[in-house]
UniProtKB/Swiss-Prot annotation:
Domain LRRCT: residue ranges: 256-294
One of the Pfam families matching this protein, by short name: LRR_9
Compositionally biased intervals (Acidic residues): 355-366
Record flagged with keyword Amino-acid biosynthesis: no
Protein name as it appears in the record: Dynein axonemal assembly factor 1
Gene: DNAAF1
Bias-annotated ranges (Polar residues): 54-68
Organism: Bos taurus (Bovine)
LRR repeat coordinates: 107-129, 130-151, 152-173, 174-195, 196-217, 221-242
PANTHER family on file: DYNEIN AXONEMAL ASSEMBLY FACTOR 1 (PTHR45973:SF19), PROTEIN PHOSPHATASE 1 REGULATORY SUBUNIT SDS22-RELATED (PTHR45973)
Chain intervals with Basic and acidic residues compositional bias: 37-48, 73-85, 367-395, 547-560, 624-643
Amino acid sequence: MHPEASEPVVDGVAEQECAQEPGVEESAGDHGNAGEGGRKEEMNDPKETCVGPLNTSCLSEQKQSGDSWSDGRLAHQRADKEDRGARMTKKFLQKLCKQHKLYITPALNDTLYLHYKGFDRIENLEEYTGLRCLWLECNGIQKIENLEAQTELRCLFLQVNLLHKIENLEPLQKLDALNISNNYIKTIENLSCLPVLNTLQMAHNHLETVEDIQHLRECARLCVLDLSHNKLSDPEILRVLESMPDLRVLNLMGNPVIKNIPNYRRILTVRLKHLTYLDDRPVFPKDRACAEAWARGGYAAEKEERQQREMRERKKITDSIEALAALRRQAEERKWQRASQEQGEEPTPAGAGDVDAEVEGEEEPQEKDTRQKIEQFVKESFEAKDELFPEKPEEPSLLEELPLDVGEPKGVLPSEVLPASPRAAWAELAPQTVATESASGTEPDGAENLEATRLETKEQLFIDDLPNLEDVNAGESLGDRDREQCFPKITAISSLSDASEPDMDDISLLALENTSSDTLSSIFAVPKDTSWRVETETPFTDILKVAPERDPETQRKASEVPRPLIQELGDDEEPSGPPPLPPVCEGEAVPAPCTEDSDGDLLPAPAPGNGPEKDEVQSEVEPEERLGSEAGENREDIEFGLD
C-alpha cells in the first residue's frame, strides 16, 4: 500500500546489522535506536546509509577495523614483555659481545659482562664453554641455574640479586671465587661440591645461627671468608671457624657477635692459628706474639713480650747501622791502602788487629755471629761493587803535572801562578833576587856565584807580589817606614846598582807621585817591539848581567855612601850635586817608563845621564823635594803605598 514507507524499514534493518558488526562505531547503533526524525536524516544522507550497492564497501571497512584492533593488541603484549625485563637471548648475547669488542664466536670468550642488564634468569649460555669469569651483578636473578656448560669457570659474581638459596653449582668444579653478597640467603649449603673454592663472600645476607654456617666445616680449601653485616650473634661460631684449616682472612664486622666476645681480637688471633687479616687490618707477627703472651700470663706478660720485641727491633736497626758503618770504614781502609801502594809504602794500621781480638773476646757467641754476618755482608758488597764497577787508574791531572816549588804559598790557584805581563815578571823578579842574595849574606862575584844565584832564583812568580795601590796612613812617620820596610832592601841593592841608577830612581819617583791612568797603563802595557819582548821574556839573564858590567869603583862608592831617607828628603842641596837615594825599594822598581811615539808603540826611555833630558829631570825633582820638606811627616808617600 505504501511502498515508500517500506523502504526505510529495510534500510533501518540493514543499519542495525551493520551496527552489530565489530569495528563499527557505537554512534551508528545509537542513531538506529533514535526517533523518526533521526532516521529520516540518516535516510536522506547518502554517506551514512548502507544501501544495496554499497554492502561491499561496508564489509571492507569492518575488515580494516578488525586488523587495526589485532595490531594494537600485539603491540600491547610486546610492551608488557619489555616491562617484565630483558631476556638473555643468543642474539642479545652476540650483540653484547660485539659491543664490548669480544669474540663473535661464543666459545672463544673467557669473560662475559652481563651485569646491570635486568635479567631475571640465567639462560642461553650453552655455547659459551670457555668462560672463566662471569659477571651477573646487579640483576633480578632469583635462582642459580643453567651453568652446566661452564666447566672452566673460575669466578662467578652474583651479588645484588634476588637469590634465596645456594644451588646448582656442581658443574663448576674449578670455581675459585664466589660472590653472593647482598642477597636473601639464610643458610650456607651446597658448597662442598666445589673442591677448589678459595674465596666466599656472603656479606649483607640473613645468616643468624651456628647451624646456618655449619656447612663451612666441609670447605677445607676455603681461605677468604666474608660474613660481615649479617645477624650472627652466637660466640659458638668460633668452633666452626677453628675447624677451617686454611682460613687466612676473616671479616665479621657488622655482626652482634663482636660485642658478645670479650677481648674479641685477642681471642680470635689466639684461636685461629693461621689468621693473617681480621676485619679491617692485618694480624702482624708482633700482634700474634703479644696475644699469645696475654693468653699465657695476662696483661703483664703481654707488656713484657712487647718490650722484648721492641728491643729486638731496635737492635736490628742498630746492626744495620753498624753494617753500614763497617762498609764505610772498610772503604776508607781500602782507599788508604791504595794510596800507600801508589806512594810505594805498605804500612799497616797500628793496633787494629789487637782491637778486633779484644772485641771478639768480649763478645757473646750471638753477638759474634752477628758480627761475622756483618763482615760477610761487607765483603760480599765490596766484591759486587768490584765486579760491577772495576776501578780504573786515575790519570794525573794538570795540577799534579805542574812542578811543586818550595816557596809556593798554599792556597794559590793555578791562574795566579803566571804573571800578568812581561813587565810584571820583571818587577816581581827583582825582590826574589834580592832576597836570595841577602839570605846568603855575600855579594855575587865571579862565574861561580852567578851560577849559584841562577839556581836559587828558580821560584814561582805571583800576582800577589805586586804592590797594593792603597793609601798609606799619613800619621805614620817616614822614619819608621824606612826602618821597617825599605832599609834592608836598600843596603842589599846598593851593591848591584851603578852610578846612573839614582837618576833613574828620581824619574820613577816623579812618575809615581803623578799617578795617572796613562802612567799606569804604560807600566802594565805590553810593547809591540819584538826586541823588547824578547828581553822581557828572559829577565834572569839581564838581571844577572848587571853585576859584572859595573866598575869596582862605583861598587865601592855605592856601598860606602848609604844615606838615611829622612836626611835626603829634608836636604836643600843644590841640584848640581849627586842626587840622593830615593825611598824606593830598588828590588821592586820597574824599568824606566817608556815614551810613546806617534805610531802608538812603546819605546824604552834612554838611560839617565846619557842625553840632554838629565838636567830637565833634575830640575823637576828639585821642587818636589822642597814640597816634601815643607809637608814634613804629614806628607803622603805613594811609593810606600805601592810596596
